[in-house]
Amino acid sequence: MSIKEQTLMTPYLQFDRNQWAALRDSVPMTLSEDEIARLKGINEDLSLEEVAEIYLPLSRLLNFYISSNLRRQAVLEQFLGTNGQRIPYIISIAGSVAVGKSTTARVLQALLSRWPEHRRVELITTDGFLHPNQVLKERGLMKKKGFPESYDMHRLVKFVSDLKSGVPNVTAPVYSHLIYDVIPDGDKTVVQPDILILEGLNVLQSGMDYPHDPHHVFVSDFVDFSIYVDAPEDLLQTWYINRFLKFREGAFTDPDSYFHNYAKLTKEEAINTAMTLWKEINWLNLKQNILPTRERASLILTKSANHAVEEVRLRK
C-alpha cells in the first residue's frame, strides 16, 4: 500500500524498517561503536546499524521540525518587535518500563547535539519528580511507584512551564535507582537549553485521562514533539525479567542498594519475583495509564526481538 493510500485511513504514515532507513538521506554517522556501547541500556543490543537506520533518520526529521520552530519564533519576534528569549524545543519520550526509553533518549541527545548547529541538548527523566519514598509510604503508594499519582505533578508541570516561559535557570530533582528514591538536595540546574528531552512513563497524559478534572494542565501541553517506544507485551515482560536478573548480579549486590536482598535470591526465585513485580505493578501501569496514551504520540517506534525497531509510525 502506498503512503498516499495510508493517509486516507489513519492519522499516521507507516514505514517499515527499510522505508524509514532510506529517509536518512546523507546524514553522516557521528557516533563511534564505543560511544554507542556507552549509550545503550543494561539489557539492550544497540548497534551502529540501528543508529544508522532508525535514529539518524529520526534526528534528521527532528532537526527539520526544530528549525521550523525557530523560524516561527523569529516571525513572532519580528511581528512584536522584540528580541526573543531562548525557548527550548521539548521532545518527550514515553513507553513501558524496560522498553528502552532511556537508550532512545540518550542516543537522540548525542545525535541532536552533533548537528552542525551545535545545539545544547539537555536530558531529564521524570523519575526525579516522583514523590520521595517517605511521602509514598504515608500515602500507601509504594506499590504504585510510576503510576500517575506517585508523581509530584505540580512540580513537573511547573518545571516544563518555566522552561517554556523562558526562565533562565530551572531546577529538576534527581532520582537514584541505587537507593530507589529522590536524592535529597540533589537538584540539577537546567540553563536555557535549545532542546530538552523529557523521558518518562506518563509524559503523554492529557486532560482526557482526568475527565473529572478538566482544568488540569499537563506536561503534554508544553511538548513540541512526542515519541512513544512500543513493543509487544510478551517481549516487555521478557526484557523486564532479564533486566532484573542482570541487576541481581550487578547493582543489587551493592550493600547500599535498596534491593540488596534480591541479590541473595536463586535464579528461579529471582525470575518469580520479577514476574510478580511485572504483573502486579508494571504491567498494570502499562495497561491502565501508559498504553492508552500511545496514539497521542507524534511518532511511534515499534520494537521486535533484540530491541530492534521494525516499524515507525509518524503522525502526518
From Swiss-Prot:
It is an enzyme of class 2 (transferase). One of its GO terms (biological process) is coenzyme A biosynthetic process. ATP binds at G95, S96, V97, A98, V99, G100, K101, S102. Keywords: ATP-binding, Coenzyme A biosynthesis, Cytoplasm, Kinase, Nucleotide-binding, Transferase. Gene3D superfamilies: P-loop containing nucleotide triphosphate hydrolases (3.40.50.300). Pathway: Cofactor biosynthesis; coenzyme A biosynthesis; CoA from (R)-pantothenate: step 1/5. Its main location: cytoplasm. Pfam families: PRK. GO terms for molecular function: ATP binding; pantothenate kinase activity. Its EC number is 2.7.1.33. GO terms for cellular component: cytoplasm. It catalyses: (R)-pantothenate + ATP = (R)-4'-phosphopantothenate + ADP + H(+). It comes from the Bacteria. It is found in: Cytoplasm. PANTHER family: URIDINE KINASE. Belongs to the prokaryotic pantothenate kinase family. This is Pantothenate kinase. The lineage of its organism: Bacteria, Pseudomonadati, Pseudomonadota, Gammaproteobacteria, Enterobacterales.
